Amino acid sequence: AFELFIEKTPPIGKSFLFLDDSNIRKIIKQLKTKNYFTYGFNKNSNYQICNTKYEINFTKFDLKIKNIGSKNFHIKNILLNLIGKHNVHNATAAIALCLNLGLKENVIKKALKNFSGVQRRLTKVFTKNKVEFYDDYAHHPTEIGSVLEGVKAVGKKRKIISVFQP
């Protein structure tokens, strides 16, 4: 079904495919169309995430853009006031889409810098005595794993306690 959806993308449209996902890589091998761009940490991505730095209150990363027509360029120091690898993935997909719509790099970077996230998606509730409390509405194992990975990236030597309500 997903392959058919991509194949039916009209010539004026583009699909943006997450190349870090092994299932997407398998699907790409079977596609007849080239009407898509890829993004992710994978070095073969058209929009490759690199130089990622995870901090307590923000994430900073660069983006190598390659094989987009005759364009190859680098966007440096993209600042997200969010933590977690999943947020970097989502931001990269948004950047790719915005660039394809003709938005300027500085406009995109400013919008991402000012974006504070979605409520209950790794929302910092409070900090007290070096203890941070986050609220997240992850509801399946993949999302829960992404949240824990994001928290671990910024709390490298800190204890993490998770409370889960099924």
Stretch-by-stretch model annotation:
Residues F133-H139:
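Switch II (G3) loop of P-loop NTPases
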Residues A1-F133, A153-K159:
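Acidic, Mg2+-coordinating active-site environments of NTP-dependent enzymes
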Residues V118, T142-P166:
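Active-site beta-alpha connecting loops in nucleotide-dependent enzymes
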